[in-house]
Amino acid sequence: MNTILMIPTGEGVGLTSACLGLIYALDCNGIKAGFLKPFSQELPNQVDRTTSLFSHLFQGKTVTSISHEKVLQRLALGERDELLEEAVSIHRNVAANYDVIIVEGLLPNAQDHFATELNAALAQALDAKVVLVSTADVQNPRRTAEKIEAHLHHFGGVSSNRTAGVLFMRTRGLPEETAQIPLTIDPSLRLNTEIAAFSQELQRYNRNLGTTTLPIIGLVPFSNTLSVPRTLDIASIIEGDWIHQGEARHRRILHSSLIASSIEYELNKFVAGELIISASERTDVLLASSLATSNGIPLAGLVLTERKAPNPQILDFCQHAIKQGLPILHTQLNTLETAQRLADFGNEIPVDDTERAEQVTRFVSSHIDTAWLNSQINTGVQPRLSPSAFRHELVQKSIAAKKRIVLPEGDEPRTVQAAAICQSRGIAHCILLAKPEAVVEVAKARGIELPDDLEIIDPDLIRNQYITPMVELRNGKLNELQAKEQLQDTVVLGTMMLALDQVDGLVSGAIHTTANTVRPAFQLIKTAPDYSLVSSVFFMLLPDEVYVYGDCAINPDPDADQLAEIAIQSADSAKAFGINPRIAMISYSTGTSGAGADVEKVAKATEIAKQRRPDLLIDGPLQYDAASVESVGRQKAPDSQVAGRANVFIFPDLNTGNTTYKAVQRSANVVSVGPMLQGLNKPVNDLSRGALVDDIVFTIALTAIQAEQQLEAKAAALAS
């Protein structure tokens, strides 16, 4: 068992972010990492942030810390050893479930003067490797080195085998472009050149800092973007009352502006992410905020100060903007005091802000040295495909595939942002079907930076060239006039581009129905030669493993032959994404314990699938618990190689599949990726109309990998 104790050198070093980033880096490498904070420094009834965020982000087992009050009492009574024994007991309770435990040390402050001494004793008690977590300034290496030196001697100094390295957080003095926020862990962001240069400067004051004796395991830049609170978070800070909360939980404050002059001189401040602060009597500011919102500019919110809240008649006049989610707060504080309180607002991540925590976690993990990480882990640990590792592999495979993906909903804001992310990070070459000026307008309103090589095609300029090919593809089922009319739909137009091999895949559905996305694919792309139907799978990202669920979106009631085909398609999809498939054909009974048409269908489908693909590990009928829970599987199907170990679940009908997928997703708080369509000649994928930007990015990545998989399959078929 490996234990790494994270020791902060002071307040404000980003200790929570450091712990979560290290856990995520381990998780992406298939190492199951747990978290422990033995000693609480929170007040009674306060929730520990790191513990809570770890539980949310990794669905990990947590234990209650020893209360701050109890720590003080024990130390006052001279019972330090007993306190450490209790910490060891808690550690052993958690450690049984993990390969590595990340332990958060005490924060040295004026109240807890004993923190550093107790941290040193804790390191010995847990036999832990120590990582110092500190801020840094590349322009002031002397101060940085002295701060590290001052803490090292408590842990045996540089020569101690216990000291594993230093993680520099919130590093000042680095170029602004080094603070990119990745979609998943991205080792290419690690600042190797900057670390080498900084190490040389540090070694003028401490010859071991930045060497193999005391390595710098990460130089994490300061990021303004990651320090931004939600509009929701400021209400208590400014003693505000909500006039309209709107989208305050989702909007973030990138900047704040105090409006004091005439409105015509302040209009340039009404931009995406801006928090507008103004006296309540300034109805012109309220109206300008409403107009900006109506024009598609997502302001962070509006804070009205002093006196009474605005007249209800004025608010009624602004109803259109209010319905679009504009958050509006009122505070009795004056304007200057409001602005000052916001300026003094801390960088801590609230326990319920999992979106920001996820971004910070990915950001920090990308700057951690994976070679150092691997050197700290016992060689006997068996890597697993965790959700983090799956998403990381997803992005890396799509980058390697270098595919062209067309996005028919080209001016839809989430799609534009997803395309910009994919293009800038090399996930795919994205093609937006939309008027270029419309895309530019969306990007400007939303603060999206469009990459220079992002391709935007005006549908009106290319439609006519697809009329004749479309008539030919439909084999006389429509004439040129009908083809021209159907091509007004950009989904049909994008599907024609795919049919003619001008792109490698298509993603749609942010504003279109599933039928709108899938129907043109059935008509123009058709099924692959080996298949008679199209089905779908969801990748279910459970805490310890990735499951594949099929079919949960397309086929209402497949017969035995079709069910066997869905199983084979799903197994091949699993393989394409690095999952070694163990396929369970799900039914309400296991083996021969039940009877009836539904059970017989599943049994027959299992036999057909085994005959067609003897290379696959398939079993059924199996109940869900017999397929997924090892103890139940051993009891109900002791001779099965799949029972209790299944990772691909094939449901007998759409009702069962869709219900199970949604129940697992909601009740277990499981992230899902999909649906991914399978069985088509070329990849087409449908989005949920409530899809987030990250959902669209991952679907684009899925589509790119599918395109590469199909290309490899065709090449293999030709070779044989």
UniProtKB/Swiss-Prot annotation:
GO terms for cellular component: cytoplasm. Keywords: Acyltransferase, Cytoplasm, Transferase. It comes from the Bacteria. InterPro entries: DRTGG, P-Actrans_bac, P-loop_NTPase, P_AcTrfase, P_AcTrfase_dom1, P_AcTrfase_dom2, Phos_Acetyltrans/Butyryltrans, PTA_PTB. Its EC number is 2.3.1.8. One of its GO terms (molecular function) is phosphate acetyltransferase activity. One of its GO terms (biological process) is acetyl-CoA biosynthetic process. Pathway: Metabolic intermediate biosynthesis; acetyl-CoA biosynthesis; acetyl-CoA from acetate: step 2/2. It catalyses: acetyl-CoA + phosphate = acetyl phosphate + CoA. It is found in: Cytoplasm. It holds the Pfam family PTA_PTB. The keyword Cytoplasm applies. Residues 389-720 are annotated as: Phosphate acetyltransferase. The keyword Cytoplasm applies. The N-terminal region seems to be important for proper quaternary structure. The C-terminal region contains the substrate-binding site. Involved in acetate metabolism. In the N-terminal section; belongs to the CobB/CobQ family. Homohexamer. This is Phosphate acetyltransferase. The lineage of its organism: Bacteria, Pseudomonadati, Pseudomonadota, Gammaproteobacteria, Moraxellales. The gene is pta.
